Amino acid sequence: MNFIYTLQELISALENCSNEEYPTVLKNLQLPYNELTPYESWKSKGYTRNCIVRTSKYELVLLCWNVNDATPIHDHDGQKCWVYQVKGSISEKRFDFKNENLVETLCTNLSPGKLTYMDDKMGFHVLVNNSNDRATTLHLYMNPIDFCSYFCEEEKVFKKKTLQYDTVTAQKEVTL
C-alpha cells in the first residue's frame, strides 16, 4: 500500500477496505497539518470535536486542543479507536480498574505522525495537551461512537455520556 498524503486518499482507502485493514491504512498515513486546517475549530477553553466524516463503518473526528486541555478518563463504548497526532504533542495515559481503583498502566507522548490504538479491552485512557502550544489529533473510530463512559473525579464512579460534535462537515463536502 502507498503512503496516504491527503484526506481524500484516506477516506477513499477507508471506504475501499475492510475494517480489518484499517491498521494497515493508518500505518501508511502521512497527512500534513494543512490537510486538516479547514476542519479545525477552536474555543477559548476546552478541546473541540470536529466531525469530518461519519459512515456506518467508521467516523473521522478532528480534535483541537488548547494548552492544558484534557479528556476525562474514558472508554469507547466497545468501539476501536486510533489516534493520529497531526500537530503539537499530546500525552496518553492508560488505566485499568483494579480493586475498585484506577491504576495507571502506561504513559506515552505522541508527536506529529505518531499513531496510537485503544479499545475497551485495554482499559481506559486520558489524553492531555501538556505542551506549550495548541495541538490537533485525528481520531478514527470503528464503528462510530455515540456514547462513552467517563470517570467522574468528584464521585469516583464511571458515568455514561452522550458525545457531541462542535462542528460537522457534510460528507458531500469531502470529495473522493
How would you label these PLM feature ranges?
Residues 1-36:
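N-terminal leader/capping segments at the start of a protein or of a new domain
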Residues 82, 133-147:
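A short hydrophobic beta-strand segment most commonly corresponding to one strand
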Residues 97-125, 163:
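Short acidic-glycine-tyrosine-enriched beta hairpin
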